[in-house]
């Protein structure tokens, strides 16, 4: 016997997409064993972009997170020589954390 209500059913596509994200992260880690160190931050940014894409596809799209995903896509699709990757990572991380903090502040006001 389990306690609490059963978890909500998940969409098979979401499960597959999460597994594919895990495979991407694992293959990225493996690739980094032989790739130049500078590839690591770009692969992490692409992993974040893929995770945010899952939210857009399977969740309730959040305009602020969609903008972050689009910033990452624009950086990843262009010439990486033109991208200030440290600044992009710092800025987009701050933007994602701002969304989380705003959500939590809103949820605590409802209690």
How should each PLM-predicted stretch be described?
Residues 28-74:
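Amphipathic alpha-helical interaction modules
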Residues 71-111:
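Amphipathic alpha-helical binding modules
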Residues 2-39, 93-101:
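Short terminal alpha-helical segments
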Residues 12, 35, 59, 79, ...:
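Charge-dense, low-complexity intrinsically disordered segments
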Residues 17-20, 24, 47-50, 67, ...:
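Charged, amphipathic alpha-helical oligomerization/scaffolding segments
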């Amino acid at each position: 016997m389990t306690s609490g209500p059963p978890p909500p059913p998940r969409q098979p596509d979401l499960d597959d997409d999460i597994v594919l994200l895990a495979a991407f992260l694992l293959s990225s880690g493996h690739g980094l064993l032989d790739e130049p160190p500078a590839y690591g931050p770009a692969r992490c940014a692409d992993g974040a972009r893929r995770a945010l894409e899952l939210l857009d596809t399977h969740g309730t799209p959040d305009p602020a997170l969609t903008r972050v995903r689009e910033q990452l896509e624009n950086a990843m699709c262009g010439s990486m020589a033109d991208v200030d990757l440290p600044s992009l990572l710092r800025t987009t991380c701050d933007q994602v954390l701002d969304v989380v903090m705003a959500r939590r502040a809103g949820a605590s006001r409802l209690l």
